[in-house]
Amino acid sequence: MFIVFLLVVLATTVGSFTLDRVLEGRNAAAIDNALDQRDPKRQTPGCCWNPACVKNRCGRR
C-alpha cells in the first residue's frame, strides 16, 4: 500500500512540473505579444493592432 502511495505522489509531482513548464512557455509568448502591442518601438510602422483592420494592413489577408 505504501508503494502505491509513493507512485501516486511521484506521478502527481511529475505531472505538476510538466504542466508548469508548458504554462510558462504560453505565458512567455503572451507577455511578449502584449509587449509588442504596447511598445511603439516594437511595432511594425503603420500596422494596426485592431483585429478588425489587421486584414487591411501589414500585408495580412
Curated annotation (Swiss-Prot):
Q: Which domain of life is it from?
A: Eukaryota
Q: What information about domains appears in the record's comments? A: The cysteine framework is I (CC-C-C). Alpha4/4 pattern.
The compartments listed are: Secreted
The name this protein carries in UniProt is: Alpha-conotoxin EIIA
Protein function: Alpha-conotoxins bind to the nicotinic acetylcholine receptors (nAChR) and inhibit them. This peptide potently blocks muscular nicotinic acetylcholine receptor (CHRNA1-CHRNB1-CHRNG-CHRND), and has no effect on neuronal receptors. It is able to totally displace [125I]-Bgtx from the Torpedo receptor with a complete inhibition in the high micromolar range. It produces a biphasic inhibition curve which fits nicely with a two-site model (Ki of 0.46 and 105 nM).
Question: Which Gene Ontology terms cover its molecular function?
Answer: acetylcholine receptor inhibitor activity; toxin activity
The record ties this protein, via InterPro entries, to: Conotoxin_a-typ (IPR009958)
What organism is the protein native to?
Answer: Conus ermineus
Classification of source organism: Eukaryota, Metazoa, Spiralia, Lophotrochozoa, Mollusca
